[in-house]
């Protein structure tokens, strides 16, 4: 646990408010640099890992005007809604399990989206979804999934959600 507390402290203090820190949302490069410092073998997320039988569980760690850090716990079969992040970038760090990210494009009707691609991310993988990216995060495996999400600026509440539309020719 000390490593995770230190990781959060570095994000808050050094990157955002410490000497030479920034008082603005993080850039993609700053988010990736922070994630590169994470040693998954030393991270103990147990105090931030609560699962739910009903839906994936968002466990807030730290939030201010410039970023939001969340540990999300997914049981087998749990999925997020199809959504975008508004003006936020979202860095995902998979700490355990396999995350499936389904990428969508805007549909022919407002609030509709069509699946165009599916990607799998495993332990230690890092990816960023920028604001306009429409996607869904899924745990299609039979194992639990734990992901760290760094949103900058914080995720809008509520996020923009979409309904799936049938792919052409189906």
Tell me the role of every PLM-derived stretch:
Residues 47-78:
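A short glycine-rich, His/Asp/Glu-containing loop-to-beta-strand
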Residues 91, 106-134:
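Short acidic-glycine-tyrosine-enriched beta hairpin
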Residues 91, 142-158:
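A short hydrophobic beta-strand segment most commonly corresponding to one strand
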